[in-house]
């Protein structure tokens, strides 16, 4: 579902935020 996609993308987003 959407949450599984979110959990997959979130680490990448956090990496870009750094």
Swiss-Prot record:
Main location: secreted
Tissue expression pattern: Expressed by the venom gland.
UniProt keywords, alphabetically: Amidation, Antibiotic, Antimicrobial, Cytolysis, Hemolysis, Secreted
Signal peptide positions on this chain: none
Modified positions (Lysine amide) in chain numbering: 18
Disulfide bridge map: none
GO biological process terms held by the UniProt record: defense response to Gram-negative bacterium; defense response to Gram-positive bacterium; hemolysis in another organism; venom-mediated mast cell degranulation in another organism
UniProt-annotated location(s): Secreted
Record's function text: Antimicrobial peptide with activity against Gram-positive bacteria (B.subtilis (MIC=0.8 uM) and S.aureus (MIC=6.8 uM)), and against Gram-negative bacteria (E.coli (MIC=2.0 uM) and P.aeruginosa (MIC=18.5 uM)). Stimulates degranulation from rat peritoneal mast cells (EC(50)=19.4 uM). Has very weak hemolytic activity towards rat erythrocytes. In the context of inflammation and cancer tests, is weakly cytotoxic to normal cells, induces calcium signaling but does not impact cAMP production.
Protein family: Belongs to the xylopin-like family.
Name by which UniProt lists this protein: Melectin
Organism the protein comes from: Melecta albifrons (Cuckoo bee)
């Amino acid at each position: 579902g959407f949450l599984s996609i979110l959990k997959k993308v979130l680490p990448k987003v956090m990496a870009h935020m750094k």
